[in-house]
């Protein structure tokens, strides 16, 4: 008769003949064969289970072994060629289990530590990042960004005032120099006095606006050309706000009104000796133009003030909503901390 025994610890079995002597009695031989068969069947089941576990661990750990290659030291395998020894079979199966377990442990290395990117960031990090990104437009209602917007508006006003004032004052000076008056003119003396006063006021107002623009604009241009919101406090536009508004009003409102009056008086002085109706016609045409100009100026300034008021109101509402949200978040955070403290105290972690 033949029984199955292990030839090595890799799970390969080879049938070997069990020698049976004729000197042993038949009953003893049958009991020995039954005992040996039971031991061999138990050993065969154990070896098959260990082989299946090793194959499963090798299949599942193949990907981890590619990512984390570990060079394990080979373990010496002990071969046993004993045909019937149960003790040697137990030792071989135990050695096979230890080798399989050690190989499976080497194939599954410990997971890497969590990276610093996945770790929790402190509470002040988000606030600092949001405040440092004001230049990109993410914090549009911060005091620094609002000051930067005022800086840009003041810069535009000063540029417009300087150009307008230089142009109109130059025209007034040329008109006063080029006008030709004779001693025997029929122009009323009052009209000549009005012409002199209007021309002087026109040049003085535009020169004042031009002086303010010329003095303040370089300091503002220096900060604007740096393109950095963090340097906005170095600009004098906040302290010199009233001077900038004065230059803007002198150049666009008062200066233009005086320029229209200058045209009417100049037409009267120039054409009165030649044709009095021509002088009166110039004044008649200029009256509706002056009315339209004044109406447009009033409407424009009212619209501008209304727009500023709406923007200010919307900004205040957003600030109120932001304040309420911050208070609600702070209250929720405080409640969570208190609840966690009560839970820890109840569990006995904190006494």
Swiss-Prot record:
Effect annotated for changing residue 178 to Q:
Impairs store-operated Ca(2+) influx
* Start-end of Polar residues biased regions: 1-21, 94-106
Record-linked Gene3D superfamilies: Calcium release-activated calcium channel protein Orai (1.20.140.140)
Q: Where is it localised?
A: Cell membrane
Name the catalysed reactions: Ca(2+)(in) = Ca(2+)(out)
One Pfam family named in its UniProt record? Orai-1
Please report the record's description of how this protein sits within the membrane: Multi-pass membrane protein
Keywords on record:
Calcium, Calcium channel, Calcium transport, Cell membrane, Ion channel, Ion transport, Membrane, Transmembrane, Transmembrane helix, Transport
Record-level GO cellular component terms: calcium channel complex; membrane; plasma membrane
Q: Which GO terms describe its biological process?
A: calcium ion transmembrane transport; positive regulation of calcineurin-NFAT signaling cascade; positive regulation of calcium ion transport; store-operated calcium entry
Other information: In Greek mythology, the 'Orai' are the keepers of the gates of heaven: Eunomia (order or harmony), Dike (justice) and Eirene (peace).
How is the subunit organization of this protein annotated in UniProt?
Hexamer.
Q: Please report the name of this protein according to its UniProt entry.
A: Calcium release-activated calcium channel protein 1
Q: Which organism is it from?
A: Drosophila melanogaster (Fruit fly)
């Amino acid at each position: 008769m033949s029984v199955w025994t292990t030839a090595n610890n890799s799970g390969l079995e080879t049938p070997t003949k069990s020698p049976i002597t004729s000197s042993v009695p038949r009953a003893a031989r049958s009991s020995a064969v039954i005992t040996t068969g039971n031991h061999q069947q138990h050993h065969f089941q154990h070896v098959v289970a260990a082989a299946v576990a090793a194959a499963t661990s090798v299949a599942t750990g193949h990907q981890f072994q590619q990512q984390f290659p570990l060079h394990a030291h080979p373990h010496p395998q002990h071969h046993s060629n004993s045909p019937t020894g149960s003790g040697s079979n137990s030792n071989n199966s135990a050695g096979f289990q230890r080798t399989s377990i050690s190989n499976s442990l080497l194939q599954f290395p410990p997971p890497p530590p969590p990276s610093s990117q996945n770790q929790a960031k402190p509470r002040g990090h988000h606030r600092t990042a949001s405040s440092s990104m004001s230049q990109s437009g993410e914090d549009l209602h911060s005091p620094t960004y609002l000051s930067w917007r005022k800086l840009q508006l003041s810069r535009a006003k000063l540029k417009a005032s300087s150009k307008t004032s230089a142009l109109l004052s130059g025209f007034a000076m040329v008109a006063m120099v080029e006008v030709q008056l004779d001693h025997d003119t029929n122009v009323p003396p009052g009209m000549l006095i009005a012409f002199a006063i209007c021309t002087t006021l026109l040049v003085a107002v535009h020169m004042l606006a031009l002086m303010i623009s010329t003095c303040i604009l370089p300091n503002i241009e220096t900060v604007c050309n740096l393109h950095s919101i963090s340097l906005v406090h170095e600009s004098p536009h906040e302290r010199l706000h009233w001077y900038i508004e004065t230059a803007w009003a002198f150049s666009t409102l008062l200066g233009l009104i005086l320029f229209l009056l200058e045209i009417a008086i100049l037409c009267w002085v120039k054409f009165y000796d030649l044709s009095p109706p021509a002088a009166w016609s110039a004044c008649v045409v200029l009256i509706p133009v002056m009315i339209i100009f004044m109406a447009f100026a009033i409407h424009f300034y009212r619209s501008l003030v209304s727009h500023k008021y709406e923007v200010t109101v919307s900004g205040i509402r957003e600030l109120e909503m932001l304040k309420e949200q911050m208070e609600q978040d702070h209250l929720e955070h405080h409640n969570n901390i208190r609840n966690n403290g009560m839970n820890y105290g109840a569990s006995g972690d904190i006494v």
